[in-house]
């Protein structure tokens, strides 16, 4: 518990400092703000190592084809992946709930790197053309979109069904790269942080375009949970 307290104190203090240092990036090219995000990811890794003795292992880097356009479907157990994935992928952007955009300063950085907001569980004018905006953003940017098909953070042992949004993005003729993490075993959504653990990021082989949307979604969920069972 004490180690977790020190981790959170130093990590969030450092994160706030990074945000302050990179404030000028809000009026500069977006890649400057993206670099601030990457720096936050490395800071998270450093703090986990120093305060919780966490060993971070990344598997499957050979499955990343940086010459093609793709979106990333990632399991979501912790805040960790929102920071650390920015160290693996070049200037990624996210789909996120509208409430996050409204957070002062932090929301401005999210908008700057091209994050796409959605109003969850509600039909709105913004949601009607949502997937068109996703397609335009992916075509325009030379960086991947990251989504969390579970919809929100879940406990390590939970296996909720994936949301249909993943298949709708896949049906835009964009291949999908699955990424599986056991981050909740170290940095859970709720409860005490764990020390002396291995935090594994497993990058699976991509799903090429051409599958039926429902077939894709079922196969994606099965493969990701199968891998999650292995590394948990």
Predicted regions span which residues?
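Catalytic core of membrane glycerolipid acyltransferases/transacylases, capturing the structured
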Residues: 15, 19-38, 66-123
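Structural element of the ATP-grasp superfamily
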Residues: 47-48, 85, 110, 169-170, ...
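Short acidic-hydrophobic, aromatic-tinged amphipathic segments that line or gate anion-handling sites
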Residues: 58, 116-119, 209
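Membrane-interfacial terminal anchoring regions of lipid-handling membrane enzymes
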Residues: 1-38, 62-65, 137-140, 215-232
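Conserved H-X4-D acyltransferase segment
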Residues: 2-6, 10, 43-96
């Amino acid at each position: 518990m004490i180690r977790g307290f020190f981790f959170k104190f130093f990590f969030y203090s450092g994160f706030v400092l990074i945000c302050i240092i990179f404030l000028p990036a809000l009026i500069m090219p977006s890649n400057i703000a993206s670099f601030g995000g990457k720096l936050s990811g490395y800071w998270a890794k450093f703090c986990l190592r120093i305060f919780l003795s966490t060993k971070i292992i990344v598997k499957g880097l050979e499955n990343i084809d940086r010459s093609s356009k793709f979106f990333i479907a990632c399991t979501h157990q912790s805040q960790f992946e929102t920071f650390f994935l920015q160290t693996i992928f070049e200037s990624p952007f996210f789909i996120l709930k509208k409430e996050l955009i409204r957070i002062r300063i932090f929301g401005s950085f999210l908008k700057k790197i091209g994050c796409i907001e959605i109003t969850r569980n509600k039909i709105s004018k913004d949601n009607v053309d949502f997937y068109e905006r996703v397609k335009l953003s992916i075509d325009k940017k030379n960086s991947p979109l990251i989504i969390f098909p579970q919809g929100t953070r879940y406990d390590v042992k939970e296996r909720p069904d994936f949301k249909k949004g993943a298949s709708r993005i896949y049906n835009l003729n964009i291949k999908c790269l699955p990424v599986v993490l056991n981050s909740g075993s170290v940095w859970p959504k709720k409860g005490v942080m764990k020390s002396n653990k291995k935090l594994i990021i497993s990058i699976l082989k991509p799903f090429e375009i051409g599958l039926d949307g429902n077939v894709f979604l079922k196969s994606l969920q099965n493969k990701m949970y199968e891998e999650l069972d292995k590394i948990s």
